[in-house]
Amino acid sequence: MGKLTGKTALITGALQGIGEGIARTFARHGANLILLDISPEIEKLADELCGRGHRCTAVVADVRDPASVAAAIKRAKEKEGRIDILVNNAGVCRLGSFLDMSDEDRDFHIDINIKGVWNVTKAVLPEMIARKDGRIVMMSSVTGDMVAESNPAASPRRSAGSRRTGGLPRIG
């Protein structure tokens, strides 16, 4: 039995990189997984983990769209039941100087890295409050506390993610 046996974890941005690593680690520790990603390729990771004996559901959603998030979470909960752990991992990083960054690039970062976290947390939190149980993990970076010259969009969005988390324990 693993440390997370009997717990269901929703991991956003689970297809690759850190999100995939979190999914594999949680699976090794016995968690039931809900893997959320914008890419339908997330099904392949879910199939692989299911093939290794882990309980796993893949859902495709765009974290920028609250309706997409709500529909995906509804589908996942119909299959997996409650969500015990939320890992807000989905994020993007387009490198470039501040002066070269377009308004579209700025909005892209904000929509995924700030609003996306907001949308997923808002969809999951009410049930956790009602149960008086649940855990939310916010992925961030040291760039929340410093400015990276090659990535001016990262610092504000990482800082926003880190700072927003502070008030959540007081809710409910």
Residue ranges and their predicted role:
Residues 8, 15-16:
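Conserved glycine-rich cofactor-binding loop
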Residues 29-44:
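Conserved glycine-rich Rossmann-like NAD(P)H-binding loop of the short-chain dehydrogenase/reductase
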Residues 60-72, 103:
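The beta1-alpha1 cofactor-binding region of Rossmann-like NAD(H)/NADP(H)-dependent oxidoreductases
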Residues 97-98, 105-110:
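Substrate-binding pocket helix/loop in short-chain dehydrogenase/reductase
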Residues 101, 147-156, 168:
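Active-site loop-to-helix junction immediately N-terminal to the catalytic Tyr of the SDR YXXXK motif
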Residues 121-122, 167:
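A short, exposed helix-loop element centered on a Lys and neighboring polar residues
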Residues 141:
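Residue(s) in the substrate-gating loop at a strand-loop-helix junction
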